[in-house]
Amino acid sequence: MPTRKISIPPGYLKADMHCHTYHSGLTGHMEAFEPMDCYSSPQALYDLAKKRGMDLVTITDHDSIDGCLAFLEKNPDAPDFFIGEEVTVQVSEFKTNVHVAVYDIDEKQHREITHLKGNFDDAIAYLRTNNIIHALNHLFHGFHPAKQGYAFLEKMISSFQLLEGLNGAINRGHNSITQRLGELFPGKSLIAGSDSHTLLRLGTCFTACKAANKTQFLQQLQSGNTLIGGKYGHFHHLFNDAMGVYLNYFRDLAFRREVHVNWPFWKEIRNGAGWFVCLPVFFSGALGGLFVQQCIERFRQVKYEELIAALSTGEGLDQTIVDPEFVSTTR
């Protein structure tokens, strides 16, 4: 299995900077049965992350900090936990969304970010003004490089100091492209996270900073003094995640009753039976859909490589693209 192996020097702390719980909400697939995007609980995620060697823990649910707040309600004095969120921000000029990870925020900041996420420029301006740690997750996810590729890259590169250079759900080729961007442009640093939607891959990717405690770790992260390591994604990781969600749906209905606890009995029977009957469809659909997705992404990867090659030879973006105001406020 492809791995980015690094030797962590003494005095460094590690954290998986991208992971989810059931507070990420509903998935966009098989909506009639209302499956969640993830079935991991905040406490289970924390416990397993610590068991797998993470010194610090965060949760980055989609557009929600409810999982973080639920954990802190039960563990108010946890010295090794900080609030995170993966915010879906609209970039209207490219007719796409990007996922922006934000860290060490409070409830008021979450509400402000939620209010601004419909406008990329306003959201980034708020994050900079308030000195909030933020990173661009999986840079090329959902954006076709043939559609204003240079312009999109220019906007993203000028907007972020931190880029997710290792995502555990993405193959080595795509991760390496972001890593090369981090090398091409001054002032850019990388973070890593498993992007786990089940507990299977939790902690398989990590960000390390030289620090003795959470406060120092976040300061180093803000300054871009990071190391990244872990396992690259593969087709079978995504398939395992999909099947994990399928099985955990049944587990919650039959035994745990933690996620779909408010469903009436008739709805549990209807959705559970429908979910079971759809197993062949789900299995073949997940297998086929993920295979097609991988083929498309491999084609796009070629286009990304062409963009990066042009950048490295000076044919594309100005390699000095850095926002001086941003650098001066975060380094």
Regions found by a protein language model. Give the residues of each.
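Divalent metal-coordination and catalytic microenvironments
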Residues: 18, 61, 81, 102, ...
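Binuclear metal-dependent hydrolase catalytic cores centered on His/Asp/Glu-rich metal-binding motifs
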Residues: 96-133
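Structural recognition of alpha->loop->beta junctions
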Residues: 150-172, 209-219
